[in-house]
Structures are given as C-alpha cells and as structure tokens.
A protein has these predicted regions:
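A short glycine/small-residue-enriched secondary-structure motif
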Residues: 47-52, 81, 103-108
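Mixed-charge interfacial surface used for oligomerization/domain docking
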Residues: 2-5, 14-28, 33, 39, ...
Length: 284
C-alpha cells in the first residue's frame, strides 16, 4: 500500500484497467451494475464480458450506476485502509451519471479529502488518468499537486474505437454525435472517439472492417508521432484474434510504451458496444 502520503486512487469499473495494473498500482475499483430481468451483477466482479456476449441472443441487459451503498462502502474501506485523501477517476459525465453519483456521495463523507475527476473519456483512456495519478503518488508528490497534474493529464488521453455494428450504441442511447444512419448497405465503419464534451463523435469514416482496423493503426501512429513517454492500450470486445493482428502491426509502439495494457473491455461497455469492438487507448 502506498501510504507514505495517505493518498488513494479509485476508478470506476469502466476505466477498464487490467487486474494486474490495479494490483501493481494499488487502485481501488468501483463497479457499475449489469441488470438482467432475473438478476443484477456487479461489473467485472460477478460477471465477465464473455458471459454478457454469450447471453446477447436471449437478452441484452440494462446497465446502471454504482449503487449508493457500494460507493459509501468503498470509501469506508479506503478510509479503513489508512487513506484520508482520494483521487477518483470517473468515466465521462457526457456518457454516464457515474461521476455525479460519486460526487454526491463524496460530499457527505467526513474526515476525507475526495476529488472526483471527470475524465471526459471512456474505457482505458479514463483508466490512464487513474494510472497517471498513481504514478504521481508513487513519486511522492503532495495531494494538491497530484490533483492538478492529473486534471491536466485528462486532455492528454484519447480513445479510438470501431464497432462491429452501431446497433448497440443506438439501442443504449449512447450514439452521441455518431450518425446512426451510417449505412450498413455501404458498409461504412466510423472510427469513434470522445469529443471535448466527453460525448462519442466520429473522427474518421472508412469502408469495411479491414479498412477500419488499418485506420485505427494509422491513427495510433499519427497520434503518438515522436512521443517517447506514452501509455498505450489495445482492447477488444469479443474480437480477440483481430486485436492480436493490431498488436502485431503496432509491436514497435507496444515495446516502447511506458505503460502497455491489453484485453477485453468491461461487461458494461460490452453491453453498449456489442461484439466486434476494437479500440486503442493513448496518453501522451
């Protein structure tokens, strides 16, 4: 535990930080909820992405915010572990009410200094904000400086992703500025990111899956440019083999990353994007 200056980092489960990095950086996780007609599950705790995809044919579940009691219990656990200052990395307020829900509960907690950062992002692009905060804490910086540097780092983090179909984003009401009429007849595939308001927006359009993958690779190289000090992630939603193809194409950048993460997106994000997602997270 990093108790030298009693600062903890908390991230919601849609920050998509792999378990090994959570353990290494001592980051606490707050799960969102997945709700089927017959039962509810804590994201990444009680249910896996594979289980969500397997059940899509019979039921597409709803998702919801972390339960208030879960938020309160999590802060109580952090306090019991000896921390009195907390930096929270929350997925975009433009896509979820999670950030606001945590802030409301945090306001009622006494004897703890809690700063909730709206990452205006999603998935590992939010997770990189949490990992950056943990890095500053490890370096021994005081709380106020960790907060200011982490808030500044929000603008340095980017998500880029393509989906198998826009159907799930449309059903979940998370389509943002991505046009739902991008024709399946034309096989147009948008590359999606979060804009400055933290809402999904189209940053490129290509034709077909193969071109979509190539565009993600090209945009990754373009965004990283000559940067030497960067975080990189390659993620997927039920598209493991294609993720490996992307990783092979980007192996030089993978090898040079200060932090590299890969894996399947969280069950909650899988509900909203459907099978076939391929994504890239970058922080420079």
């Amino acid at each position: 535990m990093m108790k030298s200056n009693s600062i903890a980092v908390l991230a919601d489960s849609c920050n998509d930080i792999p378990q090994e990095l959570l353990d290494k950086c001592h980051i606490y996780i707050l799960p969102l909820m997945i709700n089927y007609k017959d039962a509810s599950y804590r994201d990444r705790v009680d249910i896996t992405p594979e289980q969500v995809y397997e059940r899509f044919q019979e039921e597409i579940p709803k998702t919801s915010l972390p339960l208030p009691e879960t938020i309160a219990d999590t802060f109580a656990k952090i306090k019991a572990d000896g921390f009195n200052q907390v930096i929270v990395s929350a997925i975009s307020s433009g896509l979820s009410g999670t950030c606001q829900a945590i802030r409301l509960l945090a306001d009622d907690i006494e004897d703890m200094q809690i700063v909730v950062i709206d990452t205006l992002n999603i998935a590992i692009a939010s997770g990189f904000v949490a990992l950056y905060a943990a890095e500053q804490i490890e370096a021994g910086l005081p709380f106020e400086e960790v907060v200011s540097k982490t808030q500044a780092a929000v603008k340095q983090s980017t998500i880029l992703f393509g989906v198998g179909t826009l159907e799930y984003l449309m059903k979940g009401g998370r389509i943002g500025k991505v046009s739902g009429i991008l024709g399946s007849a034309l096989n147009i595939k948008p590359i999606i990111s979060c804009n400055e308001d933290g809402i999904y927006d189209t940053v490129a359009k290509v034709r077909g899956r193969k071109q979509s993958i190539q565009k993600l690779i090209d945009m990754t190289r373009e965004k990283l440019g000559q940067h030497k000090n960067y975080y990189l992630s390659i993620c997927h939603g039920d598209a493991y083999e294609e993720m490996l193809v992307m990783k092979d194409q980007l192996k030089d950048l993978v090898a040079g990353a200060k932090i590299y993460a890969e894996g399947q997106i969280s069950p909650v994000l899988g509900v909203h994007t459907g099978p076939g997602l391929l994504g890239i997270g970058i922080m420079v």
